[in-house]
């Protein structure tokens, strides 16, 4: 038994949209290990991560209540018994924060960054947040092998709240990062430099082309903001793969 929508999203992600990201995740999970899906949304990565993790736990964090409930049901229908769904946001501190959600329902563009509300109509939900370091101490056993992060501009805070875990376990990191979502005064290049300083090499995933060394990333070239839905353009790239220095690519 499976959830057809979840399986279809997983197929599209693995074989069309995020080929290089999923390939790296599969390699990192050989032999098992904990995997974390931060900003799981509707589970595009989750199905594959759960299968490849074997008997190891996979934890998905989704602060939108409707989507967290959906994921819990979808994983149950798909028989993904090693998956835990946490209706939590992740940040650099624990507490309560406002989640800004475009439109009047759930959205893949929901963010803990208030600046998103300056660009589009949003409604607010108060959500519980914690840090990955705190969560790991209280809930995780065994090394973390993979962390995927898609949090619409809040990735810097998520990484800052996970520095202990990252330094200890050196997991593969797959992180969406876009200049249009970065906090004021911050750049994609600065974010890349921070993660690289933790002992990583970085590449930009370019569907259909390959992986570009992240040092060659140029905002004006790889994330051009031309047209109404520029983020959907085939030559717009926003996923970075961070491998521990010395790991095979």
Where are these regions (language model features)?
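Phosphate/nucleotide-binding beta-alpha loop and adjacent structural elements of enzyme active sites
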Residues: 1-249
């Amino acid at each position: 038994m499976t959830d057809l929508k979840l399986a279809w999203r997983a197929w599209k992600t693995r074989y069309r949209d995020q080929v290089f990201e999923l390939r790296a995740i599969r390699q990192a999970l050989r032999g098992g290990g904990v995997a974390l899906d931060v900003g799981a949304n509707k589970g595009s990565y989750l199905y594959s991560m759960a299968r490849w993790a074997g008997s190891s736990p996979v934890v998905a964090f989704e602060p939108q209540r409707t989507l967290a409930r959906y994921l819990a049901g979808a994983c149950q229908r798909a028989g993904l018994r090693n998956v835990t769904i946490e209706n939590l946001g992740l940040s650099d501190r624990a507490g309560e924060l406002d989640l800004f959600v475009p439109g009047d329902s759930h959205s893949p563009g929901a963010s803990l960054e208030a600046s998103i509300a300056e660009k589009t109509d949003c409604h607010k939900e108060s959500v519980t947040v914690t840090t990955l370091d705190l969560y790991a101490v209280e809930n995780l056993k065994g090394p973390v092998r993979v962390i995927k992060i898609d949090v619409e501009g809040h990735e810097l805070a998520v990484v800052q709240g996970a520095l202990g875990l990252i330094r200890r376990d050196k997991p593969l990191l797959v992180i969406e990062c876009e200049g249009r979502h970065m906090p004021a005064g911050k750049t994609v290049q600065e974010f890349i430099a921070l993660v690289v300083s933790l002992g990583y090499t970085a590449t930009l995933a370019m569907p259909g082309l390959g992986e570009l060394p992240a040092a060659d990333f140029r905002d004006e070239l790889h994330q051009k903001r031309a047209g109404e839905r520029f983020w959907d353009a085939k030559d717009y790239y926003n996923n970075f793969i961070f491998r521990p220095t010395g790991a095979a690519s």
